[in-house]
């Protein structure tokens, strides 16, 4: 029997509609719409698409998107100068620096220059530290989006074994913290993990964020599992797939996210929700 689908498009549409009403209410009360600064350095094709999608999503819910498209040769000093201006601006509630950055710019340094209360990506060490200490405020968008998906479908991770494949700062590490916060027993696997198959086979929840296709063999999967595929890869024919072979996996597990249409839409709506949350906090 095929797996049940975890539909990120449907759930994100519901959350966007709710967020749109919240923004409208605040505007009708005489407050300005939340403002999100979206900074793109260079013209990497994937980044251009991601930024365009984020700007369109802002427009859809009534959040004001402020665009800053900078040339690839922009210096780190110039970028820091812009961030400082955005940190001080009363019109900006959230700052998003589209990653990856050009090689001559230190990503960690740039993230640390963003005010934690405007860090709507949730990457600042302060915000990650709050999550680690079980007192989160602005949380990384993809992991929180995944948790919201699981909550909607009443897929409870408490007392379950969750295995996270991938240990990046953007997904894997904060994902493990979110799962711990929700009461799961968590195993993190990465490029140095030996006997990966063993960990995959005993997972109740499997979150795959390797950035590579087919690291997880389909025959390792089990029929009771909930599989969250964070990967996104464009194939030569123009189609998109995840880290896992969906057509095979959907026949083996209990629940699975499609790619596209699973995690991606939830990441974007969570970014918008973080911007709304930041705006509310800054008005206090």
Swiss-Prot record:
Q: Which PROSITE patterns match?
A: THF_DHG_CYH_1, THF_DHG_CYH_2
Which pathway does the UniProt entry assign to this protein?
One-carbon metabolism; tetrahydrofolate interconversion
**A GO BP annotation:** L-histidine biosynthetic process
The source's superkingdom equals: Bacteria
* Presence of keyword Hydrolase: yes
Q: Does the keyword Hydrolase apply?
A: yes
Q: Where does NADP(+) bind?
A: 166-168
Q: Per UniProt, what is one GO molecular function of this protein?
A: methenyltetrahydrofolate cyclohydrolase activity
- Similarity annotation: Belongs to the tetrahydrofolate dehydrogenase/cyclohydrolase family.
Q: How does it assemble?
A: Homodimer.
What's the stated role of this polypeptide?
Catalyzes the oxidation of 5,10-methylenetetrahydrofolate to 5,10-methenyltetrahydrofolate and then the hydrolysis of 5,10-methenyltetrahydrofolate to 10-formyltetrahydrofolate.
Protein name as catalogued: Bifunctional protein FolD
Q: Which gene encodes it?
A: folD
């Amino acid at each position: 029997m095929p797996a049940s689908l975890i539909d990120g498009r449907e759930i994100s549409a519901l959350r966007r509609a709710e967020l749109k009403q919240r923004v409208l209410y605040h505007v009708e009360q005489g407050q300005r719409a939340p403002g999100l600064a979206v900074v793109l350095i260079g013209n990497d094709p994937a980044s251009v698409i991601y930024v365009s999608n984020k700007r369109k999503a802002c427009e859809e819910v009534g959040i004001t998107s402020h665009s800053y498209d900078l040339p690839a040769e922009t210096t780190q000093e110039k970028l820091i100068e812009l961030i400082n201006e955005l940190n001080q601006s009363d019109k900006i509630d959230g700052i998003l620096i589209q990653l990856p950055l050009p090689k001559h710019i230190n990503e960690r340094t740039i993230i640390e220059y963003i005010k934690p209360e405007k860090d709507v990506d949730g990457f600042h060490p302060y915000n990650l530290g709050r999550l680690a200490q079980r007192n989160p405020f602005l949380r990384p968008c993809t992991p929180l989006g995944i948790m919201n998906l699981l909550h909607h479908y009443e897929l409870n991770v408490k007392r379950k074994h969750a295995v996270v494949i991938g240990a990046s700062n953007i997904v894997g590490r904060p994902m493990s913290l979110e799962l711990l916060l929700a009461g799961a027993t968590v195993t993190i696997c990465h490029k140095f993990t030996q006997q990966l198959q063993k960990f995959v086979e005993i997972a109740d929840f499997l979150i795959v964020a390797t950035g590579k296709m087919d690291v997880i063999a389909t025959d390792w999967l089990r029929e009771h599992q909930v599989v969250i595929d964070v990967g996104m890869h464009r194939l030569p024919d123009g189609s998109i797939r995840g880290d896992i072979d969906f057509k095979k996996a959907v026949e083996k597990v209990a629940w699975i996210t499609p790619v596209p249409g699973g995690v991606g839409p939830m990441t974007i709506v969570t970014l918008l929700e973080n911007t709304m949350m930041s705006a509310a906090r800054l008005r206090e």
